[in-house]
Amino acid sequence: MQNLKKLLSYARGQSRLYLLALIFTLFSQVIVAMQPQLIRITIDSVIGGAALPKGLISRLVALFKNHLTGTSGLIVMASLVVAFSLVRGLLTFGRINIASIATERSIKTLRNRLYNHIQLLPYSYHSKAETGNLIQRCTSDVETIRLALYSQIMDTISAVFLIIYTIYLMAQLNTSLMLISFCIMPLTFFSSAIFFKRIQSQFKKATEYEASMTTAIQENLTGIRVVKAFTRHQYEIEKFIKRSERYRNQNLKINNSFAAFWAFADSLSIAQVFGIILYGSLLAYRNEITAGDLVAFISYTEMLIWPVRRLGRIISNIGKSFVSANRIETILNETPEDIFPTNEKPEITGNIVFDSISFSYPETQNQKILDNVSFSIKSGQTLAILGPTGSGKSSLVHLLARLYEYDSGSIKIDGKELNTIDKGWIRSQVGLILQEPFLYGRTIMENIKLAVPGISDSSARHFSKVAFLDDEINKFEKGYETLVGERGVSLSGGQKQRLAIARTLIKDSPVIIFDDSLSAVDTQTDISIRSALKEEKGNKTMIIISHRISTICDADNIIVLENGKISQEGTHEELIAQEGLYKRIYDIQSAVQARA
């Protein structure tokens, strides 16, 4: 019941349209249930000459009582069948259109809600979530919900209504025949319910396997350069084939379960019809029922079989939608990041103080990434951070951008505690340039203007010149209107990094962080960019993470991180004068440069 409530909650706001579509559906089913009565009257009254039986249909037919004999009578009855079919067709047309409008509105709301919620989830969630899995939940799972709202729930109500109404009409004809027909129905229904309960776990597995395939495709296409460079295409093919076979085998298992269920259901249906024909013929032979009654009863029995069997299939399909709803709710139940937790939006000048900061990632609480880290930067200064891989360099600047929250200690910007400042505001004041920048599959100009869409083309070109990218862009056939491809695949690593630098400089943030974002450019370009940045810098505070000594040697202060702790701190001249990691790296790089 909880799953059904969850599914129906997606229809909120469109309940009137769904109710109208349901009314159209139920009237349509009433017309379907009346057709065997027309057959009964045709056989007994029009052909057999008996008096019209009691009932609503008989009152309608009585309007044509002067034309119910011979050929004219058959024409009247045939015309009524056609008229009923036309009315049912109009009701079906109305139901489909109304249900379509209601469903598309509901699904648009759900899709937007899901996408918006994903946007608001914290960086810690996205760092461990599988992209392919998220994509499937926004597409395949939402589509499964759409089918449930559009037809499956309404078909369930329609089938239950038709079953109840048909049993009522059968009881009006003959109670004993109705009981024979009804006695098998619970067995059919409960077998459907048991089957649905067992098949639901199989649907869940199939959905997970499909998500695994989607993830494999997404990872392969995203990393196609690596696949080509390391000739890993055969490995990727084999990996996908294994996942595809696993998905296929799971679907075959589901199909085999369905085949067994439908074979059992068919046997019950045949037994039900056979019992009605056998006992009904005996009653007709004894003149306890008419030939028209028997034919109508057989029609009702077949009419009863279909919704009962269909109910099993619908319930099974709703089982899929329950799985999809649970997968969607898993995301919606994730606590979103509160981007604007306070109204604190102080003017940022760039005075930064880290005081005894400790930090661990949520999934590795026992492993400290940063341990009692303290340092300070004055407005307009440049701080450089050096350290081996995994020492906590990127984690440190992620804390400053509030992508993660620190466990203990204090970070203050211009005297304000960082965690009291609006996340949205602090991120607008901190420009973060990553080592592997993400570019959208748009033009170069659109990617540069991403941070400030309304900025002029001339300003965008100016910052491209600062990043020493303008000359290279102008060599492209379409210049700044060149499409960079998905994730910037048409650009080199250095070009992507420089585009990201230009994009961040446009923000005019008082604090700019370079997270090893000059690693893909040559030394001379590195020097040229840093020289241009000095002229452009003004009073901005800069934090530069790099493994290259030449990139950070001009910084006002340099800290060396090892195992999450500051092992050294000082200027370039001070650090090369003392034993430690900084001097060792400096000596190695100097020796390599001398040999070059």
Identify the residue ranges that each predicted region occupies.
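An intracellular "coupling" helix at the cytosolic face of ABC transporter transmembrane type-1 domains
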Residues: 13, 123-124, 140-149, 153, ...
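Membrane-integrated ABC transporters
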Residues: 1-35, 39, 45-81, 87, ...
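Helix-loop-helix
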Residues: 169-186, 190-192, 253-326, 331-332
